[in-house]
Amino acid sequence: MENFKLKIKKEDKVKVLTGKDKGKIGKVLKVLRKKNRAVVENINVAKIHQRPTQANPQGGIVDKPMPVDCSNLMIMCNSCIKPVRVGIKQLEDGKKVRICKSCNEQIDA
């Protein structure tokens, strides 16, 4: 498996492009860089059966968001308010920031 430079980060707002949750928008909770996947809030939710423990004596069925491949996600631009491709630009002080390819606005806060 190749290591890709992921442009998706935690707390980003993304839109799902394919699959059962196509068109939904959610916030990235966790990025799994080695597997090229991301866990997105309320996307690809699975029902997990938890056995009773001391912390949770009743156990039961819990909804848990599962990882989605990053190729199926697109970052939402705050100024365009649509899913966009992302580029990287280096500022004069040497800092690298993510920019929107359609409006050239900075995505990083």
From Swiss-Prot:
Record key words, sorted: Ribonucleoprotein, Ribosomal protein, RNA-binding, rRNA-binding
Recorded GO CC terms: ribonucleoprotein complex; ribosome
Transmembrane segments: none
GO biological process: translation
A Pfam short name: KOW
Disulfide bonds: none
Domain of life, source organism: Bacteria
InterPro entries in UniProt: KOW, Rib_uL2_dom2, Ribosomal_uL24, Ribosomal_uL24_CS, Ribosomal_uL24_KOW, Translation_prot_SH3-like_sf
GO molecular function: rRNA binding; structural constituent of ribosome
PANTHER family attached to this UniProt entry: MITOCHONDRIAL RIBOSOMAL PROTEIN L24 (PTHR12903)
Family: Belongs to the universal ribosomal protein uL24 family.
Role: One of two assembly initiator proteins, it binds directly to the 5'-end of the 23S rRNA, where it nucleates assembly of the 50S subunit.
Quaternary structure (record): Part of the 50S ribosomal subunit.
Protein name: Large ribosomal subunit protein uL24
